[in-house]
């Protein structure tokens, strides 16, 4: 399973047959938080405006207990082409053992072609804290600057 070493964690990964020739997820720079995921498509596909598709990555990962995988958009795809991860961030639970797939949506008014090997999203491995609910009759209602305000209450 996973082993933590100085802000690093080992995660088991297996390339599926349709992803054998693709790179493993990797960091673009030394300070990148996320690792790029690649489209493991047989043929190019077109993502039409307002269409969503589940894109295979050709990998299976074993995330250690106490961690999760987060699938996030690539900023360049979102800013330049309106392509983003629909359920962002997508969560990969530590007990999931299927292929990592990315649900992309095209929010632009132009079709977008996705080719085999395109970098389509990024994955982060992050710690997860288990919540223990404290069912309280009375909550701490100490006044705060925000109080019960939400949904735009702090200004534009």
UniProtKB/Swiss-Prot annotation:
Keyword Magnesium: yes
A GO molecular-function descriptor: dUTP diphosphatase activity
Keywords carried by this UniProt record: Hydrolase, Magnesium, Metal-binding, Nucleotide metabolism
Protein name (record): Deoxyuridine 5'-triphosphate nucleotidohydrolase
InterPro entries reported in the protein's UniProt record: dUTPase, dUTPase-like, dUTPase-like_sf, dUTPase_trimeric
Enzymatic reactions: dUTP + H2O = dUMP + diphosphate + H(+)
Required cofactor names: Mg(2+)
Biological source species: Wolbachia sp. subsp. Brugia malayi (strain TRS)
Pathway in which the depicted protein is active: Pyrimidine metabolism; dUMP biosynthesis; dUMP from dCTP (dUTP route): step 2/2
């Amino acid at each position: 399973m996973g082993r933590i070493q100085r802000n690093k964690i080992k995660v088991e990964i297996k390339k599926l047959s349709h992803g054998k020739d693709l790179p493993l997820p990797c960091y673009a720079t030394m300070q990148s938080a996320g690792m790029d995921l690649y489209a493991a498509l047989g043929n190019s596909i077109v993502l039409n405006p307002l269409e969503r598709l589940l894109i295979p990555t050709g990998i299976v990962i074993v995330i250690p207990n106490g961690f999760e995988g987060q699938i996030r958009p690539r900023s360049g795809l979102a800013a330049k082409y309106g392509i983003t991860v629909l359920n962002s961030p997508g969560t990969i639970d530590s007990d999931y053992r299927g292929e990592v797939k990315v649900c992309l949506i095209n929010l632009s008014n132009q079709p977008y072609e996705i080719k085999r090997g395109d970098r389509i999203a990024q994955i982060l491995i992050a710690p997860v804290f288990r919540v223990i609910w404290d069912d309280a009759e009375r909550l701490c209602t100490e006044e705060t600057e925000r109080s019960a305000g939400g949904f735009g209450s702090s200004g534009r």
